[in-house]
């Protein structure tokens, strides 16, 4: 476990917009070995694309339909030529850096990083508090 960060004021935390999103599509990022590119239903008509550094832990095909928790109000950034408009929250207990297996699939320690999710389906775009 990593060392805890210093406490922050509640008003800083209240500025973070946490939402539930549903993964509509997931694929390997074309320009980065460690990233996946995900299309999310975030409750808006246009949805959003997010890039996540979880390629060593997740097979993209297993993510479609999964509900995840996102930081919805991060400014979009370019990650290796692809827009990432938000961040998917994940927990990790990493002992060593994961390595992608021979066939491009996650290695044997596939659960070292896990996405945060909801325990029952909710409407995409639902606020997390």
Model segments located where?
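Phosphate-backbone binding interfaces of nucleic-acid-interacting proteins
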Residues: 1-129
